[in-house]
Amino acid sequence: MANGQYLQFVDADDSLISSNYDKCLDFIRFKDADIVLFDFATKEVSSAQLANNEVFSGTEYMHNNNLRASACGYIFKKNLLVNLRFTKGILHEDEEFTPQLIIRADKVYNTKVQAYFYRKRKESITHNKDKRWKLKRLQDTEQVIKSLQDKADLMPAKDRVAMLRRVAQLTMDYIYNIIILTRDE
């Protein structure tokens, strides 16, 4: 288990962009942020960018913004994890995890800073062409949608609306992926 107050996930092939990531850490140092969101770069970025100072609750953020669910796209307070874990055995498990995490936060900063270097790989799960994998991806997405819908049904009204917005986004992605992943090549 991690020892610090904050957690950051990093894929083994990727890295943090130090000068820009330091800007994100300032929100932790000086603003007591619960979650700091940042952008990915696919090319090396040399200069630090200015960060956005606007703060939202997690519910407000989800209600008013399209969520990028990658667990590598933010740093967060470890105490938000109470009874929240990734579902084992499913693809894109962060699609289920991230909205539940964000909705728990009181102070979310969306910096727009490119602080994470994402290395594109042909062998990644998003590029897999195997039919069994495509079917699993669709089934797992459906499972995530149902899970978030069930959780939304138990939430207070304001949180429920925000979570249902995310469910609607995932449902549209699911429909799109059915078309893309099942068409003849």
Protein language model regions, located:
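Conserved donor NDP-sugar-binding/catalytic core segment of glycosyltransferases
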Residues: 19-48
